[in-house]
Amino acid sequence: MATEAPVNIAPPECSTVVSTAVDSLIWQPNSLNMHMIRPKSAKGRTRPSLQKSQGVEVCAHHIPSPPPAIPYELPSSQKPGACAPKSPNQGASDEIPELQQQVPTGASSSLNKYPVLPSINRKNLEEEAVETVAKKASSLQLSSIRALYQDETGTMKTSEEDSRARACAVERKFIVRTKKQGSSRAGNLEEPSDQEPRLLLAVRSPTGQRFVRHFRPTDDLQTIVAVAEQKNKTSYRHCSIETMEVPRRRFSDLTKSLQECRIPHKSVLGISLEDGEGWP
């Protein structure tokens, strides 16, 4: 009689291998927060097929799909069925060299060719315009003031020159007249004789002194002044002679003769100065 050997039903190895493979494919960014609890296996019990399908669905649900525009190659060590993606930082670092290769180097150099200009404010432009206008106005004022000053100085110079010329002409005339009068004084200061025609005249000086003397009708008024200076021992410059008769007459031109001035016999004449001093 054959004896029955004890049959040990061992758990299938395939299920354990599949479960470990599924657990390795699950992307766990944080092992503390996202930890999948595997069901405990018992000896002599086979795991249901539902567990395997759930693990695959969880893996497909949690794995983000890679961007379609940028293909990438898997490393040779990784299995083609693995669903663990690369980190986003690593993908961005892989994309940067490719973008740098696509962008030409001439563009960046052309942008940095010229330095950045400072910003131009409108206030600065207005202030500069105001300053330029003020400078132009001040320069115009200075030029006009200089022109006026030059004109005034020119007119003053011309007026001074004219006045000097006039004064020189007057002095020359006076010198010539005094020379002529001096020559006439030297020859006619003597009193005329009884045989000559003569006029008796009384002469009063500016100081009030009087003298009586005979003069010729041809004697001029300067001779009368010279005789008065000789008698009073003084000099009378810029003087004139007036008559005491009414109406009074005044003679400033001393070159005229007594006959020309129509001075009669026994007349009273007074010498007055042009500066206001004279007989009362």
Curated annotation (Swiss-Prot):
Residues 41-94 are annotated as: Disordered. SMART domains: UBX. GO terms for cellular component: cilium; endoplasmic reticulum. Its main location: other. The keyword Flavoprotein does not apply. Keywords: Cell projection, Cilium, Cilium biogenesis/degradation, Phosphoprotein. It is found in: Cell projection, Cilium. It holds the Pfam family UBX. One of its GO terms (biological process) is cilium assembly. GO terms for molecular function: ubiquitin binding. The keyword Aminoacyl-tRNA synthetase does not apply. Changing residue 246 to A: Reduced interaction with VCP. Residues 194-271 form the UBX domain. The modification Phosphoserine is found at residue 87. InterPro entries: Ubiquitin-like_domsf (IPR029071), UBX_dom (IPR001012). Belongs to the UBXN10 family. Interacts with CLUAP1; the interaction is direct and mediates interaction with the intraflagellar transport complex B (IFT-B). Interacts with VCP; the interaction is direct. VCP/p97-binding protein required for ciliogenesis. Acts as a tethering factor that facilitates recruitment of VCP/p97 to the intraflagellar transport complex B (IFT-B) in cilia. UBX domain-containing proteins act as tethering factors for VCP/p97 and may specify substrate specificity of VCP/p97. This is UBX domain-containing protein 10. It comes from Homo sapiens (Human). The lineage of its organism: Eukaryota, Metazoa, Chordata, Craniata, Vertebrata. The gene is UBXN10.
